[in-house]
Amino acid sequence: RGLEDLSMILCDIGNSTVDCYQEGKVWTLSHAQFKDFSTKERVYYICVNEELLSYLKHRGSYVDLEPYFDFDTIYQGLGVDRIAACCTINDGMIVDAGSAITVDIMSSGVHLGGFILPGLEAYAKAYRSISPRLDMPINPSIALDALPQRTNDAISYGVVKPLILMLEATCKDKRIFFTGGDGKFFSKYFTNAFFD
């Protein structure tokens, strides 16, 4: 076989988007764009979206990686996206800040457990459902060292500060690995953080 036969695409299919990787290049597709995506290469994927998972079962050149993970944990219902992330580190805390914020702790290669929080957009949606006057985006530059003096900052502070405090209390001195659409946003609050 020639080297061109070894080309492949890796995809992480989340609840909101599909992140793809091929030969050092990374790109993001919407679910609709992914359904229209066409390639001659084999596509290896992990998927947490049930609709796309059903769709991909009938695509011959697409390979679901979930059955190939051998991950020992007592956690019930751990998603393949979290399993894949946990398999990449031996010690530390993994924070996938996407549609939901998932947090998992690894110690000496053992999964100690984790928790799930709403993602930033879910918090914003909750505020919108309370009142149209609270329909404001979460401000990623919110100062956390002083109490807010306007509604937009108060909303952002009320979302970001408790999340940061919870992550700090959980990670203690562990390294923190951030991923997901809002991972870069959260990583700036920690000196022991890595974003990928």
Language-model segments: what does each one mean?
Residues 7-24, 89-110, 127:
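Gly/Thr-rich phosphate-binding beta-strand-loop-beta motif of the actin/hexokinase/Hsp70
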Residues 50-56, 184-187:
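Short, charged/polar "capping" segments at the starts of alpha-helices
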Residues 1-7:
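Short, Lys/Arg-enriched N-terminal segments with co-localized hydrophobic residues
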Residues 40-49, 174-182:
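Short glycine-rich phosphate-binding loop at a beta-alpha junction
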Residues 24-38:
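A short, well-structured beta->alpha microelement
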Residues 57-89:
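Glycine/small-residue-rich loop that forms an oxyanion/phosphate-binding "nest" at active or ligand-binding sites
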Residues 84-91, 112-157:
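Glycine-rich phosphate-binding loop plus the immediately following alpha-helix
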Residues 143-175, 182-185, 192-193:
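Adenine-nucleotide phosphate-binding core of ATP-dependent small-molecule kinases
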